[in-house]
Design a protein with these regions (language model features):
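Bacterial Sec-dependent signal peptides at the C-terminal "C-region" and cleavage site
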Residues: 4-30
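Cleft-lining beta-strand/loop regions that shape enzyme active-site pockets
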Residues: 22-25, 42-52, 211-220, 234-258, ...
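Charged, amphipathic alpha-helical regulatory modules used
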Residues: 24-130
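Acidic/histidine-rich, surface-exposed loop or edge segments in extracytoplasmic proteins
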Residues: 34-46, 84-88, 204-208, 372-375, ...
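PDZ/PDZ-like domain segments forming the peptide/carboxylate-binding groove
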Residues: 66, 87, 106, 110-117, ...
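Extended, domain-scale alpha-helical bundle/helix-rich regions
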Residues: 120-258, 262, 267
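Conserved functional hotspot residues or short segments at active or partner-binding sites
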Residues: 122, 145, 153, 168-184, ...
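Polar, glycine-rich mid-to-C-terminal structural blocks
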Residues: 471, 483, 490-555
Length: 698
């Protein structure tokens, strides 16, 4: 099966990547990025806005939300001052100006400089742990504080809440140590010491937070502003400066050129969190998890100090072309300093690719396929990996193992390539349409299975959850409409029913963007099920719904600002898969889950969490806070103490996969570790029972 020509949901398409050049506009020293960006969005988006006062007000509100969603920094007076821009942002964008952003940013920096000393003073001495005040955490719309005094009081309450929570957990941890009689190993600290540590942790959290704001340069600020503009068209249209585009490509291909280390920022240092097995760093052997990177040199060139550098900027220095050398000056946990030379290579992130295992249950063997995303390497021009081809390979391997059914796990799979979703769906049916697509002109096209073969015709379950989105929803919806698979999962999938493509912004550069303007991911189409419905907003409702502890909390597309509406189109013509026992199999599964004690507990806990999430008042008195936490613990004790009993017998890696890595212990461990996580997985257990019922009725 070859990859067809249909667009990807979130990747570059050679067919549709349109270059939209500006006319001979005079930029007058303003930022050309904004002109180019709004030109592309206005001409290429599925549902473009006119640059008018209404559009201006949406951008105004979105910028404020991105800068201060929790109303921690701006007062109502600040908003009143900024409101002079509410209906003029559209006029500014037409000439590349960003006066509103600069004004909002200036006020934000003033507020940081006002609030930080107040925080330092407030946390310089023990807090009042006998306070009668409360701190209200709510999901309802927050209001801006009327003045600085009210803002500071809100901060003091927030600081008290944060510190009491940290202090409570330290006291609890210490009590647990006492009960386990480990006090001889771990020194028991007095209350004053614990309180001091809690205050310092709160202070450090705030300082790190403010530091991240202050590290943002003009490019960062304009990139944020550009995304505030694209987001009002819809939440999946985004701007990518050149550096972010590189990260996006990694997420789509599962590959990058670099040293093979996962990095984080800690106290101004770049810290090594993990070494990727089989990578350049792993083979070189000196760089270890826990090392702090102090300097970076390109080959024999002078080293650049990266302490206190933004993590993204440091990563750009460390990454580089395959075959080039980078020299890292690192500080080891024992304090010694080492210079480590590493020759960069292509790093393959194996856990981002499809993988399979065998599950034994009641004397039968079933296949498990995990697919983290619908990845596709379009830039490799036919030589790169595609998720649909990898799934075809996994299916062939499982067929060689003579499995009695297959479950494909799409939980937390946020989507990816539309082309691969179409081709992958076609692996399970002989022929027919997979998805319908509507463009801005309202023209509807059907995307068919590209061949008449069926790679796997046996029992099939698709496992989903709320974070199965986009391409995942296309595959699940198509196989549900054909009645080819039984869909099992939480009450619905994410609800993203739109198609995006990456469009390069017109060539050029500016002092702020010396490497060029990057690209914009633009929504250009909506997709629809073959039954005429759409997954937009409401997702795919499983045939067998499994209770989830977050059922009472709204999630997914419908909770996102500026989402596109739900609608329908006429159904396509298609023939149902022949499975006369499907309805009975689904009915049996529903009855089984309704009787399941574990799912009854989950439903009960979901109701409790929903009440807490909507609004909760925390006591700012330490004794009162302890009582509240005790009550919360007692509420879910029944859930925490429940001993889940797995249903499946065993799960293990395919012999052919283990044979490939028999001489590499790290890669062998990788092949085995991911399977262990499924050994107490209620979703997998129910899926396997459905497959068993299905296989018994063939």
């Amino acid at each position: 099966m070859k990859i067809n020509k249909w667009l990807s949901l979130t990747s570059v398409s050679a067919v549709m990547a349109v270059l939209v050049f500006c006319s001979n506009k005079q930029l007058n020293g303003n930022e050309p990025l904004l002109i180019r960006l709004t030109d592309v969005m206005s001409t290429e988006h599925y549902s473009p806005y006119k640059l008018n006062d209404q559009f201006s007000e949406m951008v105004f509100n979105n910028v404020l939300k991105n800068l201060d969603d929790d109303k921690h920094f701006f007062t109502q007076g600040d908003i009143d001052k900024l409101s002079v821009f509410k209906k003029s942002i559209d006029d500014q964008l037409k000439v590349g100006r960003y006066d509103f952003l600069d004004s909002a940013w200036s006020i934000l920096m003033v507020r940081l400089n006002t609030i930080e000393p107040m925080i330092e003073k407030e946390l310089s001495k023990p807090l009042n742990y006998k306070s009668n005040n409360n701190y209200v955490v709510t999901e309802k719309v927050l209001k801006y504080k009327p003045n600085i005094a009210a803002l500071e009081q809100d901060w003091k309450n927030w600081l008290q809440y944060q510190t009491i929570d940290r202090l409570y957990r330290k006291i609890e941890d210490q009590e647990n140590v006492k009960q386990k009689k480990d006090s001889a190993v771990i020194k028991i600290l007095p209350f004053d010491t614990l309180e001091f540590k809690a205050r310092n942790e709160t202070l450090k959290f705030c300082k790190d937070w403010f530091k991240r704001w202050r590290k943002m340069d003009q490019k960062d600020k304009l990139s944020l502003y550009a995304n505030c503009i694209t987001e009002v068209y819809d939440p999946h249209s985004n701007y990518f400066p050149p550096e972010d585009k590189a990260n996006f490509d990694i997420s789509m291909t599962g590959k990058l050129e670099g040293i093979g280390a996962t990095l984080s920022e800690k106290d101004g240092y770049v810290k090594v969190e993990r070494i990727v097995p089989g990578s350049a760093s792993a083979r070189q052997g000196e760089l270890k998890a826990g090392d702090l990177i102090l300097k970076v040199a390109q080959g024999a060139a002078d080293a650049v100090d990266i302490v206190d550098m933004k993590l993204d900027d440091a990563i750009q220095l460390i990454r580089g072309k395959k075959g080039t050398e980078v020299r890292l000056t690192v500080k080891k946990p024992d304090g010694t300093i080492h210079v480590i030379p590493i020759v960069r290579e292509v790093v393959v992130i194996e856990e981002s690719y499809a993988r399979s295992a065998i599950v034994n249950f009641k004397g039968k063997r079933f296949g498990l396929i995990q697919l983290p995303s619908f990845y596709a390497d379009f830039a490799a021009q036919g030589r790169g990996r595609h998720s649909s081809e990898d799934i075809r390979i996994e299916l062939e391997k499982l067929k060689m193992e003579k499995v009695d059914g297959i479950v494909m796990d799409l939980r937390n799979n946020g989507g990816g390539s539309l082309a691969d979703a179409i081709d992958m769906s076609g692996l399970f049916i002989e022929e027919g349409p997979i998805v319908q697509v509507k463009d801005p002109s309202q023209r509807i096209q059907q995307a068919p299975d590209p061949d008449s073969e069926i790679q796997y015709a046996g029992p099939l379950v698709i496992l989903t959850n709320t974070y199965s989105a986009s391409a995942s929803e296309i595959l699940a919806a198509a196989l549900q409409d054909y009645q080819r698979a039984v869909i099992v999962g939480t009450n619905t999938t994410f609800g993203k029913g739109t198609v995006q493509t990456m469009m390069p912004l017109p060539s050029g550069k500016s002092p702020i963007f010396p490497k060029g303007y990057g690209e914009v991911k633009v929504t250009i189409q909506k997709f629809y099920r073959i039954n005429g419905g759409t997954t937009q907003l409401y997702g795919v409702v499983p045939d067998v719904i499994l209770p989830d502890i977050y059922d009472g909390i709204e999630q997914g597309e419908k909770e996102m600002d500026y989402h596109m509406p739900y609608d329908k189109i006429p159904a396509a013509e298609y023939k149902l898969f022949k499975n006369k026992n499907r309805a009975d199999i689904v009915k049996s599964a529903i009855v089984r889950t309704q009787k399941n004690e574990y799912y009854k507990l989950i439903s009960k806990r979901a109701t409790e969490l929903a009440k807490m999430r909507n609004s909760y008042t925390y006591c700012l008195n330490l004794d009162g806070y302890k009582s509240q936490q005790k009550q919360i613990k007692e509420q879910d004790k029944y859930f925490r103490d429940y001993k889940y009993k797995r249903v499946i017998d065993t799960a293990f890696a395919l012999p052919i996969d283990l044979d490939e890595v028999k001489n590499d212990e790290l890669k062998k461990a990788q092949k085995l570790d991911w399977i262990k996580r499924y050994m107490k997985d209620a979703g997998l257990d129910e899926s396997i029972q459905i497959l068993y019922d299905w296989s018994e009725r063939i």
